[in-house]
A protein has these predicted regions:
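FMN-binding flavodoxin-like domain, especially the glycine-rich phosphate-binding loop
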Residues: 33, 79-88, 109-170
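N-terminal beta1-alpha1-beta2 submodule of the flavodoxin-like/Rossmannoid cofactor-binding fold
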Residues: 1-100, 105-109, 113-116, 120
């Protein structure tokens, strides 16, 4: 059994958003083909994403400097527990499906916030001999994205290079 984490990063619903329609159809077809797999849908606009701010950074610094989790304030513990839950969910998933529109040639800000939160040194990457090295091996990812133009499957190399969000997720 695999765990599939669907990260929906679109503020609109399926009745007006092509990527959401395609994402929902993909999940339905996947579930029919793999009924034993667990599918977890995380809607970044419905459920929100904890923002990285001075409070989180202060809490992370305290932990790095030797403060125990129990010594943190109740508010700091609540904040970090939400972040840790999202990180663990991401780390333990076997497959990822990112569903998003292309905004300004990139990904929506909530998806970037989410990735900043879950891609963490020592958990998802380490500093290797030749630079950063990922630690989440043998995982698969799919990016379902709609855009207002054609950026792939074109002879125009310039247009293909403008899809920064897809390249970023790779």
């Amino acid at each position: 059994m695999s765990t599939v984490l669907v990260i929906k990063a679109h503020p609109r619903t399926a009745n007006v958003a092509n990527s959401v329609v395609i994402g929902e159809r993909f999940v339905e077809a996947y579930q029919r083909a793999h009924p034993e797999d667990q599918i977890i849908v995380h809607d970044l606009y419905e459920e929100g994403v904890p923002e990285i701010n001075s409070s989180n950074l202060d809490s992370w610094t305290k932990l790095t400097n030797g403060t125990t989790y129990q010594e943190l304030s109740e508010n700091e513990q609540i904040l970090l527990s939400r972040q840790q839950k999202l990180q663990e969910q991401f780390i333990h998933a076997d497959k990822y499906v990112f569903v998003s529109p292309m905004y300004n040639l990139f990904i929506p800000n909530r998806l970037k916030m989410y990735l900043d939160l879950v891609i963490v040194s020592t958990k998802t990457w380490v500093e290797g001999e030749h630079g950063p090295e990922g630690t989440l091996h043998d995982k698969k990812a799919l990016h379902i994205q709609s855009s207002g133009g054609t950026y792939h499957h074109t002879d125009n190399e310039f247009m293909a290079k403008l899809d920064l969000g897809d390249s970023y997720l790779k």
